[in-house]
Curated annotation (Swiss-Prot):
Cell compartment(s), UniProt: Cytoplasm
Keywords, alphabetical: Cytoplasm, Transferase
Gene Ontology annotations for the cellular component aspect, listed alphabetically: cytoplasm
GO biological process: glutathione metabolic process; L-phenylalanine catabolic process
Stretches assigned to the GST C-terminal domain: 96-221
Protein name per UniProt: Glutathione S-transferase zeta class
Residues at which glutathione binds: S20, S21, C22, S23, F24, R25, Q49, V63, D75, S76, Q115, N119, L120, A121
MF term (GO), any: glutathione transferase activity
Length: 225
């Protein structure tokens, strides 16, 4: 992968789990910006996020976390904003304030109203409260509600990508969520033609494809699934 020169600096380290959509967002950004990084797998199913070593990096025990020299940043949105300011090559935010606002809104719908309801802790909790036949439909309903809002938000703004013909922040949040909806939760995407079209556009971009869960080194681990 082509990389931006970082003289006299150690390589970036990304603590990631292959299936984590939050980590997926950051992997896309690193690829878009051409930043070389070391992938450090954290197996969530084995509880490695709660080890003393990882909790020193991120006390809340979530992935992703990024180490850049002496800087340690956790939370995908914080990481993306850090990367945008420190490594401005291939900006992930548009200059236009109105378009920027749409990007923030789309990212927030995903990160606040959809993704938290499908994370591992929530799925385990829901699995204790409902039958196995009810768990996936519960997740599908919440994803579909968020997707319906995104379809309305992006109407009139989308071009080749979510907010025009360049890849921006909204796209980094959308593709991991769409991918999870299709591959993990069997959401019927024909209800959301705009999002489905965007998903197909992302499939043509190597920066997105190289960030896919099945392309990560920990996806082949016997305990990964």
């Amino acid at each position: 992968m082509a990389s931006v020169e970082q003289p006299n600096k150690p390589k970036l380290k990304l603590y990631s789990y292959f299936r984590s959509s939050c980590s997926f967002r950051v992997r896309i950004a690193l690829n878009l910006k051409g930043l070389d990084y070391e992938y450090v797998p954290v197996n969530l199913l084995k509880g490695e996020q709660f080890t003393p070593e990882f909790l020193k990096i991120n006390p809340i025990g979530y992935v992703p976390a990024l180490v850049d020299g002496e800087d340690v940043i956790s939370d995908s949105f914080a990481i993306l904003m850090y990367l945008e300011e420190k490594y401005p090559e291939h900006p992930i935010l548009p200059a236009d304030i109105h378009k920027k606002a749409i990007n923030y809104q789309a990212a927030n719908i995903v990160s606040s109203s959809i993704q938290p309801l499908q994370n591992l802790a929530v799925l385990n909790f829901i699995g204790e409260k409902v039958s196995p036949d009810e768990k996936v439909p519960w997740v599908q309903r919440h994803i579909s509600k968020g997707f319906a809002a995104l379809e309305k938000l992006l109407q009139g703004h989308a071009g080749r990508f979510a907010t025009g013909d360049e890849v921006y922040l909204a796209d980094l949040f959308l593709e991991p969520q769409i991918h999870a909806a299709i591959t993990r939760f069997n959401v019927d995407m024909t209800q959301f033609p705009l999002l489905l079209r965007l998903h197909e556009a992302y499939s043509q971009l190597p920066e997105f494809q190289n960030a896919m869960p099945d392309k990560q080194p920990d996806s082949t681990s016997p305990t990964a699934s």
